Amino acid sequence: MKLSVIVLVASFGFAVALPSKKREETAAENELTGDQQDAEQHMIYAVAFPEIRTSCVIGWKQQGATCERDCECCGVAATCITGDKSTGFCGYHQTPNVLGQGILYTADTIKNGFSAIFCAG
């Protein structure tokens, strides 16, 4: 009788201890999976929107410089971000959403194309 009670208690102890170790391993795996997903998201963003370093035409302004029109800024999608003022600064519209960033980049590129036509005069 004593032996069966000891076997029962030992079996119960093993049954309780085993899942807790599995939970710790699962938590560690989930943490690694989250880190991996963050790294993959960053890589997707970097591939989808590469930062192209090119020299600018003399007279074009770098990112952060003051401007009045889009055609003054260096970069395909660089725009003159004005807000409520007449003068602004050269920069890029940004959003944390990859799809939204692609849409903004495309819209700014098209807008800069038209802006270049009107600024040429």
Curated annotation (Swiss-Prot):
Highest taxon of the lineage: Eukaryota
Enumerate the GO terms in the molecular function aspect.
Answer: ion channel regulator activity; toxin activity
Disulfide links within the chain = 56-74, 67-80, 71-119, 73-90
**Location of this chain's protein in the cell:** Secreted
Tissue note: Expressed by the venom gland.
Q: Which UniProt keywords apply?
A: Disulfide bond, Ion channel impairing toxin, Knottin, Secreted, Signal, Toxin
An example Gene Ontology cellular component term from the record? extracellular region
Instruction: Show the coiled coil region(s).
Output: none
Q: Which residues form the signal peptide?
A: 1-17
Q: Which family does it belong to?
A: Belongs to the neurotoxin 03 (Tx2) family. 03 subfamily.
Sum up the protein's function in the record's words: Ion channel inhibitor.
Any domain commentary? The presence of a 'disulfide through disulfide knot' structurally defines this protein as a knottin.
Q: In its UniProt entry, what is this protein called?
A: U15-barytoxin-Tl1a
Origin species, per record, is Trittame loki
Traced from the root, the source organism's taxonomic lineage reads:
Eukaryota, Metazoa, Ecdysozoa, Arthropoda, Chelicerata
